[in-house]
């Protein structure tokens, strides 16, 4: 069987969108030659150009969907022209992720000890189901006291934990 080694051209940037009352966004950059995935949590309140005005990314998503969000982000961030998007409902994402079991995750890099305690969590790495992770991220996003950057960092931490464990179960 002929095996090709990864090349520098084997790269992909994807905007991952989780729909709902409080949509969530993560940019994933897949780089085969470096054998890595880089994740960037994008705050839903990030201001982007929309309809000749400025609007929050979440408002852009609600009004025009993921393709328009990708276009708006390309005007704000230096994203590649071939950036793709993938949108999930929270139910579909939970169903897909739950097949891999609970993820082991630590939010200490994204949230302070006080912020974690406010939600009954600690700095310790803990097992959490896909449904509980989604509910926790929605709680964070609804918290007006918590900064959008911290919420985005927590979302990226959840995606990162998912990609890092049980890699043998992920489709190839």
Task: Describe the function of each predicted region.
Residues 98-171:
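Flexible, polar/acidic helix-loop-strand segments at domain edges
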Residues 1-41, 138:
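Entry/capping segment at the start of metal-dependent catalytic domains
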Residues 35-65, 109-120:
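Flexible, solvent-exposed short loops/turns enriched in glycine
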Residues 19-21, 30-34, 44-47, 90-93, ...:
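Solvent-exposed coil/turn segments that connect beta secondary-structure elements
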Residues 1, 33, 45, 72-76:
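Terminal domain-initiation and capping elements
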């Amino acid at each position: 069987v002929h095996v090709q080694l990864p090349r520098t051209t084997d790269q992909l940037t994807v905007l991952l969108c989780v729909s709902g009352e409080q949509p969530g966004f993560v940019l994933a950059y897949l780089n085969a030659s470096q054998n890595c995935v880089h994740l960037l949590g994008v705050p839903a309140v990030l201001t982007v150009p929309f309809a000749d005005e400025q609007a929050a990314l979440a408002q852009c998503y609600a009004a025009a969907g993921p393709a328009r969000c990708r276009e708006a982000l390309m005007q704000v961030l230096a994203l590649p022209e071939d950036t793709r998007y993938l949108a999930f409902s929270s139910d579909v994402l939970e169903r897909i992720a739950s097949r891999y079991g609970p993820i082991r995750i630590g939010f200490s890099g994204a949230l302070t000890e006080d912020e974690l305690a406010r939600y009954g969590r600690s700095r310790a790495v803990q097992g959490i189901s896909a449904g509980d992770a989604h509910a926790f991220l929605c709680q964070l996003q609804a918290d007006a006291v918590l900064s959008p950057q911290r919420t985005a960092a927590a979302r990226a931490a959840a995606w990162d934990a998912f990609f890092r464990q049980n890699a043998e179960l992920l489709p190839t």
